[in-house]
Amino acid sequence: GAAMIQIEDQTFPKRCGHLDGKGVVPVAEMQGKLKAALDARQSSNTLILARTDALAVEGIQSALDRAEAYLACGVDALFIEALRTPDQMQQACDQFAHRIPLLANMVEGGQTPIQSASELGERGFRIVIFPGGTARAVAHSLQGYYGSLQMSQTTTPWRDKMLNFDELNQLIGTPELLT
């Protein structure tokens, strides 16, 4: 099963927290969602994380106030999305890190300053995610690969950056699947 479930206060349609144009539901509505999730949970091993996107919509103080209200519901972790400065990151940690795990979301090119997991841990964050980093790395590689293929009409210039057929099969476990 799921180890943790994230419930957020964004309105529909959902947007990435680092994009503009978001809205947030009223605090009481979000508290109702959190209480319902906490009441419905069948195992204490399933954690409930409350996420707020209020910073972009209502400002840092509203985001902190919402996080405080969500903490009061009894959630297991907090996520204040798209903290924009090191000062805001520290403010969130100062207010919450000694009471509940905080999640830091590192999006390359997003709103939050990128820091290493160890730096974030020293600051007070206990959960760090780098969502989409693999997709951005793969997209960058694909741009280079297809650009090279279009120019040279062959994969030869790109071969040193590729796995060959046998290497790929070893990586994905094809020999074990065929036995």
Q: What residues fall within each predicted segment?
A:
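Alpha/beta enzyme core
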Residues: 2-132, 136-147, 174
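Extended, intrinsically disordered, low-complexity segments
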Residues: 135-179
